[in-house]
């Protein structure tokens, strides 16, 4: 089976324009989270869309699904997320297992709730690549020069931009593989390796690159929200 895992566990309100976490802010005529879920609803091969949210916001997320996606709510599971990204993925996979016991071939397409401009093509590319690889990471080519500094004051390296990509989401992999790899980490490693695909890479697994889009914006600041609103208005 193929599942989607939407990471919506953040509680940050640092935009300073609302008491709502950013995934619940309005973008056009509906919340950011709803825009994101809608993109996954369009892919018929996805059995369930599991949304991991902070425990304080589970009821709110369920109410939004009832209001904006009543025809699809049977395909959507709202579950309590974890304290960080990878524990949220773990909670999402546990919710999948509760729905239907996991098999070795079950795949989860994980995605940031605050990237509402994901395309169906990106979702389908992730699913296709995951059939033949251990994991898939969605990326775009680095446009700006990337500068490395180990102390925040002086440049220590300027890597060759031709070899660099900017990571986005989705990130896709088999549910059991993630659970096994994550479970093998020490507590210290879990704190350091916060990116799921990095765990696969460090453990020597095959991680394929899927082509992202520069429009696959992650809305984390007021400026991002302004850009997103402009993009919605143009559509």
UniProtKB/Swiss-Prot annotation:
Domain of life: Bacteria
GO molecular function: 2-C-methyl-D-erythritol 4-phosphate cytidylyltransferase activity; D-ribitol-5-phosphate cytidylyltransferase activity
InterPro entries: IspD/TarI (IPR034683), IspD/TarI_cytidylyltransf_bact (IPR050088), ISPD_synthase_CS (IPR018294), Nucleotide-diphossugar_trans (IPR029044), TarI (IPR034709)
CDD domains: CDP-ME_synthetase (cd02516)
Positions bearing the site annotation: Positions ribitol 5-phosphate for the nucleophilic attack: 161, 218
Record-linked Pfam families: IspD
Site label Transition state stabilizer, positions: 14, 22
GO annotation terms (biological process): cell wall organization; isoprenoid biosynthetic process; poly(ribitol phosphate) teichoic acid biosynthetic process
EC nos: 2.7.7.40
NCBIfam families, per the entry: PRK00155.1-3
Function: Catalyzes the transfer of the cytidylyl group of CTP to D-ribitol 5-phosphate.
Protein name: Ribitol-5-phosphate cytidylyltransferase
Annotated organism of origin: Streptococcus pneumoniae (strain CGSP14)
Gene giving rise to this polypeptide: tarI
